Amino acid sequence: MNRLLWTPKQDSIQNSRMTDFQNFVEKTIGKKFKNYSELHSWSVHDLNQFWGTLWDYAPVIHSQKYEEVFRSGARFRDAKFFPGAKLNFAENLLRKKDESLALFYRGESGAEAQLTYSELYKRVGALAAYLISEGVGPGDRVAGLMPNVPDTVLGMLATTSIGAIWTSCSPDFGAKGVLDRFGQIRPKILISTDRYEFKGKSLPLSGIVTEIAAQLPDLKKILIGEYPSIESKSLEKRMESFPKNSIPLEESYKPFWGKEPSFFQTTFDHPVYIMYSSGTTGLPKCMVQGSGVFLNHWKELALHSDLREGDGIFYYTTCGWMMWNWLVSSLSIGATVHLFDGNPFHPSPEVLFKYAADRKIKIFGVGAKYILTLEKDKYKPSSDLSSIGAVLSTGSPLPGYGFEYVYDSWGKGLRLSSISGGTDLNGCFALGNPNLPVHASELQSLGLGMAVEIFDDSGKPIHEQKGELVCTKPFPSMPLEFWNDSDGKKYEGAYFDTFPNIWRHGDFAEILSNGGMVVYGRSDATLNPGGVRIGTADLYSLLETISEIGDSVVIGQEWKDDVRVVLFLKMSPESNLTPELEARIRKDIKEKVSPRHVPAKIVQVADIPYTRNMKKVEIAVKKTVQGEPVTNKDALINPEALEYYKNLPQLSVD
């Protein structure tokens, strides 16, 4: 059993939204549950009752009732949720129209902006009317090349309110990275800003907008918002450098001021979002998702995160990561969504903590990499974090010492919930739970309605053992389809090639006896020396504690009819990989992780490659080492780092 770090108080359990939902289930359908395990078991064994009860509890705003909750199909992906229902995604997010705060923004420079629910509602109505005037309708695509500012939320809500499809990329993707995505889905409207800021620099966007617009044949108009700034405003002057079919965003909808959102009524499986895979193995896959995303987000935010109307919620994310979509769904609960754009360590590591303290944020979300960076520096926030009830961590596994750092340095009274899922489902398979204790390294519980199991290589369920994370039953937020995949081969190949009709997610994980989960890394990055599969998370966890090591990546190199473990190290400033240090690293790995994890080779490199969402790319490193092409380096934030892994003489000998 991993170390116990937090236990919920009895009164907080009684008052949690999870308990309230459980009481609602007992009252409406007569089911009684002794614990969360029983509640979860019911939720996955009776999909009709669970999702139907959640629909009523939320409740989902709709104009036409569904014919049935769940209709199974011949294949996993053929299943339908809520056929016959009519609703609108944006209408379910814009439930409130009052003067309470919907959005609060702060940039790294200190610039701030805010919108009440009333103001947001009015702007959505006006922008939606403009989009309709430009011929945008149901099924058309509106793309955002956007920083994380209020106008991005406005663009998404206006788009989905008329039945069109929203898709977005972060400006740091670069022209090729953006075209690899938007070029496939061919938007009618592009929304961007005049510039954005990062690490104290003002970065204009006219160049990249001009370059990508020239290669989007269906593009009719480009709307340019003004990036929030503490400087004097100068959008009019900056507009001169954008393409001729560009107009200021605010000017586009001014003539339509006073128009209310029409909220075009769609089926439950009408497309809402197009999301993208990382694209590290080729062109990004374009995953089309519907209103099931909203219902799943609502469940995760309200029940698993205990978010309530009026609460402040924050997640450090860009608009190119699914956590942006997840965060913005908090509007459906009536919370205040806190946005931040810029570098989270500029001008100091205190910037996000000060934001949380100033705004009395209740739910504070970051990537595991952020926590581990601060842990390595033994950073102790000086801001008052007493308002934070829950810290959420995702993006990669958070090791036990990362948990302990948060409790030692941020506060002992908060609930630290590691959450794990993916862009594919726009949500989580395992995540937090206000009614359960927190143990180091563990995700507290499996998600309600998610039939998650662990399979061995032969496709048999295993318990308290490491294996493949799978989902055995459909869920509402699964992709409706992949764009440009008429025969469904890309979709089938992405999830169902390994185990027929079973969703294989690609994580190497273990479900524990207490119902929690530990994720050991991506299953395609697991090491396989001597035919025994071992995860990478435990190894990374140890290496993070060695002060001489700045960063690391480990791969399994195919060698002499077997696989050998190769460890690459980026050293801390003023440190080098000496024979003595190498011997100590091997000894520590053998004693503290396992003898199987001990590398055959340890190689010092100048840099470690990452995706733009700060995930290590073991597969790209492995391909480079083995002389195989890496097809889409633009998916990486530092593609030049792969050069350090080519033709290494140490890896051509025993």
What does each of the following model-derived ranges do?
Residues P147, I189-I208, S229, T318, ...:
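Adenylate-forming
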Residues S37-W42, L103-L157, G174-L179, N245-S252, ...:
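Conserved AMP-binding/adenylate-forming core of the ANL superfamily
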Residues G144, C169-R195, V209, F345, ...:
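AMP-binding/adenylate-forming catalytic core of the ANL superfamily
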Residues S161-E251, K360, G367-A368:
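Structural core segment of the AMP-binding/adenylate-forming
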Residues E99-L101, I224, S241-Y276, L283, ...:
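Conserved pre-ATP/AMP-binding loop-to-beta segment of ANL
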